[in-house]
Amino acid sequence: DVAKAFAWMHSNIADKDGNPNQIFIAGGSAGGHLTALLGTDDSFIKEHGLKISAIRGAIPISGLMDVSRVGRERRKGIWGDDPKIHRAASPLYHASKDAPPILLLHAEHDTADRRKQNQEMYDTLKKAGHPNVTIHELKNRTHNDIRPNLVGRNDPGGRLILAFLKKHSAHKGSLPKKQK
């Protein structure tokens, strides 16, 4: 459970000299879908006593934004046949101005529908009034090589992520006192 892991980290990071107000989430492919879902649907994080504002920023990489568009057999095996569940599991339908800053990344050679879904997510967030959403298509990348290449020296995607983290990080001052 991604929300449970986030809540644990938020509660325990100060013990390791981390700052609970500086936690960004990121993931690729299925992890990109889960990153976008946690960053847009506050019901998951509320179950753990947190607000969506506890997420400093979200970086979904080549994630699905509308699971109803996955092939029927795969969709049925993961989410069943209920359209209400498909909608609930789709970040696209949770887009709001209250989501944390979001950097959407996808590969030039992702499927056409995956690229389209990421663009639709961007457009939907902008239409909802979200002030801090950006989207980038990484050239000469496929769905499978976009993530490993992010750590390469001078990789364009890696540079975008570093710039996003720098832009949306809180003041670099002292750590907050541990809450009891």
Where are these predicted regions, by residue range?
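Residue-level signal for short, function-critical loop segments
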Residues: 29, 108-110
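Short beta-strand/loop motif that positions the catalytic acidic residue
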Residues: 98, 104-106
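Active-site nucleophile elbow and catalytic-triad environment of alpha/beta-hydrolase enzymes
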Residues: 79-94, 100
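Conserved alpha/beta-hydrolase "acid-adjacent" motif
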Residues: 111-120
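A general structural detector for well-ordered alpha-helical segments in enzyme core domains, enriched
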Residues: 1-5, 121
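Cell-envelope and extracellular/periplasmic
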Residues: 63, 106-108
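Primarily recognizes the serine-hydrolase "nucleophile elbow" in alpha/beta-hydrolase
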Residues: 4-74, 86-87
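C-terminal catalytic histidine-bearing segment of alpha/beta-hydrolase fold enzymes
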Residues: 105, 119, 126-180
